[in-house]
Amino acid sequence: MEIQNKAMLITYADSLGKNLKDVHQVLKEDIGDAIGGVHLLPFFPSTGDRGFAPADYTRVDAAFGDWADVEALGEEYYLMFDFMINHISRESVMYQDFKKNHDDSKYKDFFIRWEKFWAKAGENRPTQADVDLIYKRKDKAPTQEITFDDGTTENLWNTFGEEQIDIDVNSAIAKEFIKTTLEDMVKHGANLIRLDAFAYAVKKVDTNDFFVEPEIWDTLNEVREILTPLKAEILPEIHEHYSIPKKINDHGYFTYDFALPMTTLYTLYSGKTNQLAKWLKMSPMKQFTTLDTHDGIGVVDARDILTDDEIDYASEQLYKVGANVKKTYSSASYNNLDIYQINSTYYSALGNDDAAYLLSRVFQVFAPGIPQIYYVGLLAGENDIALLESTKEGRNINRHYYTREEVKSEVKRPVVANLLKLLSWRNESPAFDLAGSITVDTPTDTTIVVTRQDENGQNKAVLTADAANKTFEIVENGQTVMSSDNLTQN
């Protein structure tokens, strides 16, 4: 199935029920036509980071099901899988073989060997200045010692967690692995590959090792050359200043809109629509929009769309207005690597306020691109403090495990019923043609009018909203589709 211009659900294999069969059942029985695609967060055997330390891409974790379950989903929904191009688990065949056989291993060039990497740069490298220059996710050099079976030791590049060992994407053996893995994913139904942490994949002396140009384009192009003949696309994942996703988009790739979450929060906290209007006018059509994902709410992504003062205001309001949102939940004491993300569900970030939350999703639907909705957001979920405290993992505040019974109950809540109705309409409306147009006006400081029109100008959807009063009306071709006055109440 090709990528469709329909809302995409982001979910773990065991978060809507216990496994992939349950996910499929939830979609068919409880969600219906509100969702057209599914981003299945990593479902392979993994040794950490909730699937993001994959040990074996050839298998589905048996706890979730098997490839037949994945392929069954792919018959009804377009699918996105994650490929962690930057790293792989210590339990992978590659690492274990290297550990056992050292320089006799076929995988001796699969990983980035720290000492060998710096030896090419000259004597006495790395210096402290070299290490300080690296864009790091921890407060020390990004290395991990490996002890080989022959008793010797050396350091491997290790950007993220202890289980996630960096791959040398320029080595022949890694290129072969990347090609066979991606081809296998498409064979099992992937229409879109999310390249996780790709900006860290290229390492180069005398750079910060993050989004290293021009080499990063070579890496992306190599992946595209593998996928294009298979009619699959790439979605590179990067949390950074909006100018970098713009560059990626200019190269013809899908991108994420990670600026929208914070910009929308600012709009609904302040009641002012000017910055949202500015961003909607700037945004590309070939993108997937988000308000929430499996990670926290990105702050850095909105820089220069919002001023520093506006970002500070929105961040502080998030802690004031948000329900059960505390600064400590996004700190090192809750195992957070990224200080530029705030951990909360989007619903709780808006104070569990149904009107504000539904309006945030209305803004997302009218934004350029295809909307992605995280499973907790689809069910307007509140912060899961019990899971957070039992695991001391900050991001788990937004990773509730729903039983089938919970899902059936949650979809009956008015806010969820209205969201599902909104998405179902969006999926079928021709006005949201990605080849079409968007116009944005702000008649007053607190109001915004967004018009989406298809390429041939035959279909038009108009949103009129007041961010201060949290009211809105959607009109399609002269007919009111939904408004604050005609919502499902019970």
UniProtKB/Swiss-Prot annotation:
The active site is at 196 (nucleophile), 237 (proton donor). GO terms for molecular function: sucrose phosphorylase activity. SUPFAM superfamilies: (Trans)glycosidases. Sucrose binds at residues 49, 87, 194-196, 237, 294-295, 338-341, 395. It holds the Pfam family Alpha-amylase. It catalyses: sucrose + phosphate = D-fructose + alpha-D-glucose 1-phosphate. InterPro entries: Glyco_hydro_13_cat_dom, Glycoside_hydrolase_SF, O16G_dom_2, Sucrose_GGa_phosphorylase-rel, Sucrose_phospho. Keywords: Glycosyltransferase, Transferase. The keyword Nucleus does not apply. The keyword ATP-binding does not apply. It is an enzyme of class 2 (transferase). One of its GO terms (biological process) is carbohydrate metabolic process. Monomer. This is Sucrose phosphorylase. It comes from Leuconostoc mesenteroides. The lineage of its organism: Bacteria, Bacillati, Bacillota, Bacilli, Lactobacillales.
